[in-house]
Amino acid sequence: SAPKSPPEGFRSLFDGKILKGWKPAARLPVPQYPGAPFKWRLEGEALEAAKKNTGRWLVENGAIVGGQEPPGSGKGAYLVSEEKFGDFELIMDMKPDWKTDSGFLVRTLPGGSPGMQILVDHRPQGGIGGFYGNGIAGVHGMPFAIDAEYDKKGNPIGMIAANPDGDRVELSKKTRSILKYAADVDDFLKVWKFGEWNTIKVRCEGRIPKLTTWVNGLKIAVLDMKAIEWENYDAEACAKLQGRKGHISLEVHNNNFNHWLGKDRWWPGAVVRWKNIYIRELD
């Protein structure tokens, strides 16, 4: 895990006691890409209620704990840094329950999204350390996909590589090929500690950012936003939308119960935990 105090050149963004410097926000839909047609699916009281649901964010045992509010409701949320950052390295410890779809977004707008998400999809057909563009054309860079192995009682006991030939597969040649670097799933499985704390690091640099991730010291993925082709992705338009600096937001995903993942995207009562959150600004 990350050290208890900031490494040289880094400073802490969370004191382990209160959520000072962070603001909860509702997880609301955003246009798929800058200028995309957009219509609220909710209206009236339902829309107002959605805007007010900012999730369940607590501090327990020195960690930020994020979950749905109420648990099992399928309603997601963000926890957004009050500060904005341009070029930086961010390191933190994470402990997601099995069957959570989490991660954190960088260079986001004040509502927690749009932004580029570093994935902590700790669920079937998920992945850790890849990327997804929330409102950034859905750009999806994923080096590998994971699943869990279970004991005879159905309890998850460890992580395995997901079946690449199943009906419902998110990993594809496309999601892997847009990465400048993609770790091998076997190397990842050697370093990941299932059910324990793991350390994730991201480096974000450049006006049109280049993103690099590490998990427990293993380099996972590199995505150069200048050098990719993706449907509806316009590097200049997205850089303009995000700005040279943006917020960091921790994510609790919502469930779409009509989607094939259903409850498996965020299991009722599941939480994700974050601690030892340190940043080093490079600009």
Task: Label every model-predicted segment.
Residues 1-283:
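Carbohydrate-interacting regions of secretory-pathway proteins
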